[in-house]
Amino acid sequence: MEPNQEQSPNLEECLKLLKGERDEQRLAGLLLVTKFCKADDHSSLCRVYDAVGPIFLDRLLRTGMGRGTISSGRGNNRDAYLSLAVTVLSTFSRVPEIASSEDMVVQIPLILEVMSTQSGSSVLEECYEFLYLVSTASENGLMRFYESKGIKILASQMSSLQDGSHLVEISVKLLQLILRRISLDTIQNNYLAELSVIVAVIARQFAVLHNSLKFEALHLLNAILSSKDSSQLRDALQLLPQDSWSHNIRVGVMAVLQNRVAPAERLQALILAESMISMYGEDWLIRQVSTNDAQDPTPADMCLLLVLEQSRVEIAVLLNELAYLKYEAPQDTSSTAEAYSLKRQNVVVAYSLVEKIIKLVSNVGENDGNLLDEGTFTKLIQQLNETVAVILEYLEDAKEHGQKKGDDLLASVRIIGSYLAEAPLACQEKVKDLLGYMLSVEGEDEQRPFYSVCFLLPMLCQITMKVEGCKALASCGELKAVLDCLSNLIGSNGYTVEDSSCIFLACDTIMNLLLKKDKVQLTLDGSVFADLLKALAYWSENTDDMSSMMMAASICALIFDFTSEEALLNQPDFNHSTLSSLYQLIARCLASSEQDTETDMDLSEIISAGFSRWAHRYPQIKVAVKI
C-alpha cells in the first residue's frame, strides 16, 4: 500500500465506508485504503481489518477467482477484484496478530490456487508475500501451507522465476521455514520429485548470484544435502544431468572460496563440497563441463585446489582452537563444551575433504592423469604436506598433555594414515617420533587401541619392508598393539572394519618384522604372541581359503622361533587344543606345498624352514606332520 502523509484525516472516512451495508461502499473503502494507509502502520491496519471483516475479504477473493459474488460486481471486474483481494490480504498479513489468525490461515489454499492459475499475473508477488508472512506468524500457517501442497506449487514455478528475484528470495525463506519445522525424511517421502527440482533451481541461484541471496541458497542447499535423512533425495538427484545442477554448485563453491567472504560462509561452502563428493565421488572436484551459460569453463583443477587450500586453513585454525578449548579454556562449562563440539564437527568436514583429495591424488594418475598437470600435483603435495604437519603438531600437543583418548585424535591418526599410505616418507622424523603415540590412540568408545592401528597399517606395511622401518616399529613401544590388532581382526572377538585388506596388511607387517628379527635384534618373550597364536588357530579353523591358511601358518612358523611347546602351555588360557590346531595348520600347509605347485612358494619356504629350525622344541607336532 502506498504511504501518504495525510493518512489520519482520511482514515475515519475510510472506516465508515468499510462498515457500510453495501458492497460498493466496502469496495470503495478498500480502494481508499490501498491509496493512503501505510504498510507499517499496524494500528491503523488493525482498525481497517476489524472494520471490513474476514468474511467480506473471503468473499472478495472467491469472487476474483470466479467462485463468489459481490453484489455490485460484474464479470469483467473479476481480475480487479482478485488483485484488490490479494493486495489487501498481503498488507493485513504484515500485522503478526492478523497473520496468525485462523481467518488468514484458511486463505492459504485459495492463495495457492491463485498462484497455480495466475503464474504470470501481477498479483503473484503479493501471493508469495502473503504465504510467507502467514507461515511465519504461526505454526498452523506453516503446516497449512505444507498440507495444501505448497511445495508442489513452489516447485512448479521456481524454475521460471527470474534469477535473484524477490519471488526467489521468498521461496527460499519459505523452504527454510519448512525444513526447520518438518524433517527432510518426511518431505522427501511426500515430495521427492518436487524437492529435486527445487534443489536444481537453488543450485543455479547459488552459482549466478553475487548478493546475500547467494549465501541463503548455500545454507538451504546444506540444510538439504548434508542431512542424514537425504538418501532418497541424493539418489533422485543423481538421475539429473550433472551438467546443470552439479556444475552450478561447483561454480558457486569456487566463487565463495576465491572471494573475500566471511569465514563461516567458506566453511559452509566446504560442507557443501563434501556432500557433493559423497554423492559423485572425488572426481566431482576435477570434472570440467563445457557450457553455454554465463559461467566460463574454468580449469579442471581450480575447484580441487581451492577446496584443499581452504580445508588446510580450516584445519590449522580449528585444531588451534580445539587445543585451546581442551587444555587452556575453563573446563566443565557448557559454553566450552558447546564450542568444542561444534569445532570438532567442523574439523570432521575438513578432514573428510582432505582424505578424499588424498584418495583422488592416488587414483588420478592412473585414471585421469591428463586432467592434472605436474604443476598441479606439486601444489597438491605441498599443501598436503603442510596439512599433515599441522595435524602432527596437534597430536604432539596431545601427547605432551597425556591425552590418548578422543575421536578427534583418532580422526587425526586416520588422516595421517591415509596420507602416509601414499607417501610413507612424508614428515619422516616427526612420524617416527610420534609412531608409538599414534598407535596408542583410542576412540572414545574403545577400551584399547584398535582403529588407530588399522589406519596406520598401510604405512607400516610399506616401511617394514626395510630394516629401518622395522627398527622404528620395534622401538616405538607399541608393537603389542599391532599384534593385538591382528588378533582382533581374525580372532573370535569378531572386530569388523570397512577395509577387509586390513587383515593382510597386518599379516604382512608382522611377517616383515619377524623375518628381519636378527637385523632388528628383536627379542620378545613368547608370551607376547600367545593371544595372536590363539587367534591364528581360530582363523585357520574357520576358513577354507588356502592363501589365508598359508599366511596364518607362516606367521605361526615365525613366532615359534621365539618360544617352545612347554612355554606356550604354561601361558594362561593356552591349552593343548589351541596348540593342536596350530600343528594341524602347519601340517596341512606343508602337505599342500608338496602337492600343489600353485601354492605361494615364498610362504611355503617360510613354513618349511621354520619347521626345520624349531621342530625339536615342539615334540607333539611330529604326530601331526607324521614324521
PLM features: residue spans?
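Oxyanion-binding "anion nests"
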Residues: 558-561, 606
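Well-ordered alpha-helical segments within folded domains of soluble proteins
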Residues: 85-87, 127, 347-354, 412-414, ...
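Alpha-helical repeat/alpha-solenoid scaffolds of the HEAT/ARM/MIF4G superfamily
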Residues: 267, 277-401
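Elongated alpha-helical scaffolds that mediate protein-protein interactions in large eukaryotic proteins
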Residues: 1-128, 132-156, 160-199, 206-219, ...
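LRR N-terminal entry segment and analogous cap-like coil->beta motifs
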Residues: 408, 413-418
